[in-house]
């Protein structure tokens, strides 16, 4: 039990702080005697429900109902109540900090100890309950391989064996064909479906001009060769003898001008004929390819 002087000191300290109900409730718990019941504490000094803050209403209701959790901290707090009360009264009255009392004051405040929640034996913390449900994404993702169902070993075994043999043979034939094709040259079959007449005309004109020069070179070579052999002189003498016997004018039948003049005339005619014939041939080929198809051509690599 407390003396009247201590109760007056408590009231003066409550007036100085402005929150007397909170500290009064804490001091009332600290100065309680172990043999005194909770009903006696409520009759002697019971705070009003409106004076206490919300976070201490639960502790006040628990003290009124008579429920005391079995916490070892509460027993140690009740064993040494008097020194804490004296230190608090001195601190509130004088306005100075209380001296450090080693071994007398507990490490935690009584008011804060009363507010600490006590976990039941079957209660699991919030983080532990949800940590087990979360998947572990720190390691590599394991991919499950679908298992193939084993075939039934019964009447279907010979059929399955035959199917496997045919599949193996088919794959072997395909591999042999691919290997043969890979070793041999690559071939491609195509059809020439259309030829442009204008392009054909240009190509034929170029080729005919080239052939004209080839023709003229060939004529000059033959003329020189036959002249060296004396063919043209022999021919001219024979022709002159025939004309003299008949009473005609004798002259040279074969000369340079006559030979090269005739060669140029023949070459020009060949150019015109070859160019026109190539253009006409391209036009006819396009018509025939539309009717019966074009010429098939096989393209292949070098052996």
Swiss-Prot record:
Chain positions covered by the region annotation Disordered: 1-89, 132-159
Polar residues composition bias: residue spans: 61-89
Protein's cellular compartments: Cell membrane
Bilayer topology term: Multi-pass membrane protein
GO cellular component terms listed in the entry, alphabetical order: plasma membrane
InterPro entries for the chain: DUF3566_TM
Keywords: Cell membrane, Membrane, Transmembrane, Transmembrane helix
Family of this protein: To M.tuberculosis Rv0007.
The protein's name: Uncharacterized protein ML0007
Organism per entry: Mycobacterium leprae (strain TN)
């Amino acid at each position: 039990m407390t003396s009247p002087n201590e109760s007056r000191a408590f009231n003066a300290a409550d007036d100085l702080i402005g929150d007397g109900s909170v500290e009064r409730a804490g001091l009332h718990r600290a100065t309680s005697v172990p043999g005194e019941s909770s009903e006696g504490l409520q009759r002697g000094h019971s705070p009003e429900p409106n004076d206490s803050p919300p976070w201490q209403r639960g502790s006040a209701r628990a003290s009124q109902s008579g429920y005391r959790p079995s916490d070892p901290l509460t027993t140690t707090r009740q064993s040494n109540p008097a020194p804490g009360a004296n230190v608090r009264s001195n601190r509130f009255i004088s306005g100075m900090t209380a001296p450090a009392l080693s071994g007398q004051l507990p490490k935690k405040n009584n008011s804060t100890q009363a507010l600490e929640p006590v976990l039941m034996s079957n209660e699991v913390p919030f983080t532990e309950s949800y940590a087990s449900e979360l998947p572990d994404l720190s390691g590599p993702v394991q991919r499950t391989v679908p298992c193939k169902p084993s075939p039934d070993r019964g009447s279907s075994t010979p059929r399955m064996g035959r199917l496997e043999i045919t599949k193996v043979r088919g794959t072997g034939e395909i591999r042999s064909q691919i290997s043969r094709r890979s070793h041999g040259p690559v071939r491609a079959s195509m059809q020439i479906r259309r030829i442009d007449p204008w392009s054909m005309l240009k190509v034929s004109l170029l080729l005919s001009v080239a052939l004209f020069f080839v023709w003229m070179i060939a004529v000059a070579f033959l003329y020189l060769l036959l002249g060296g052999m004396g063919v043209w002189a022999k021919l001219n003498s024979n022709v002159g003898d025939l004309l003299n016997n008949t009473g005609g004018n004798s002259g040279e039948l074969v000369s340079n001008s006559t030979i090269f003049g005739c060669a140029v005339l023949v070459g020009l005619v060949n150019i015109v004929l070859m160019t026109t014939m190539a253009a006409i041939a391209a036009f006819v080929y396009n018509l025939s390819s539309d009717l019966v198809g074009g010429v098939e051509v096989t393209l292949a690599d070098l052996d």
